[in-house]
Structure formats: structure tokens, C-alpha cells
Amino acid sequence: MRGKLTLQQRLILPIVLLGLVALLSNILAVFSINNVHANAGTIVDEYMVSEGKLEEIRRSMMDIHRLALSHIVAEDHATMIRLVQEIKAEEAGLDEKLAGYESFAAGTDLETYQSLLRDYEAFKHALVYLVCASADSKTQDAYAMANGDVALWSEAAEADIDALYASVSRQAEAARGRLSIVYITSLVISAVTLVIGVLL
């Protein structure tokens, strides 16, 4: 009886061990999948969205600048009024985009974001002087303003956007590196548990 019990135990032991390995393998697989998913989600939800928002901000700045330059060469007051309305609408949209981007700015990026807001405000003030000179038929003054303060603050805001974009790209690259490490770790863990399962 005693020998028979030992034989049963010997037969059951590999099955129990295989069950434990399978359970451990499944737990580790779920953990690894969650890690990969979390890292991939961060890349998509945070960094790629942030880059997209920065491109929208850049495009809006360029559109406002283009509309202001169009105001200088406008031939009649109706066109000038329409362009001013378009500038105001674009500025309102850009104000919203900039406010929406605040949640993406953290750490050192927050300082660059604040600089972008200051440069954008200065850009808007310079546009007011440009449009006033243009509306008053002071074309030379308007061109001087376009090549002076408007260009200066537009370039400063563009530099801020470039700095934010570069920072986000670096963070996304670091997250991709972490994702690769998590993925490779997951593969190694799966391979080890598979080998252990086969050996049992």
C-alpha cells in the first residue's frame, strides 16, 4: 500500500508541477500583455496626440500670419474687414488649442509652454499694429511691422513649438525603448515557462 501511494504521488507530482507552470505562465503572460498595452497606450494617447496638437498650433500660427500679410495687400475695405474677421476667428481657435495643450506640458516643457504663450500674446499685439497701419493705408509702416515685430514674435513662437515638439519626440522615443524592453522581457518569460513546461 505504501509503495502504491508513492507511485501515485510520483505520477501526480509532474501533473501538479505542469499545472503550476501553466498557471504561472498565464499569470506572467497577462502581466506582460498589460505592460505592453500600458506602454503602447502611453505612446499613442500622450505623445502622438501631443505631437498632433503641436502641428495644429503651428498651422494656426502660420494661417494667422498669412492672413495678416494678405491684409496689407488687400485692395478694398470689405476684403480688409473680412480678413480681420478671419484673423479673429483663427486667434480664437488658436487660444483654445493652446489652452488644450496645457495638460500635455509638464516639467521643463511647462516653462517652454509658458514662453510660447508669452510669444503668442506679443505676436497678437504686433498684429494689431500691423492691421491698423494697413487699414490706415500706411503700407510702408505695415510692411515694416510685418518684417519687424510680427516676424520676430512669430519666429519666437515657432522656436517654442519646435522645442516642445523635440521634447515630445524624445519622450516618445524613450517610451518606445521601454516598450521594446517590456516586449523582449515578455518573450523571454514566455520562452522560459514554455521550456520548463516541456521539460516537465
PLM feature spans:
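Amphipathic alpha-helical segments and their boundaries
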Residues: 11-64, 77-84, 103-120, 154, ...
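Amphipathic alpha-helical packing segments from all-alpha helical-bundle domains
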Residues: 85-100, 156
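Cytosolic-side ends of inner-membrane transmembrane helices, especially those
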Residues: 14, 189, 193-200
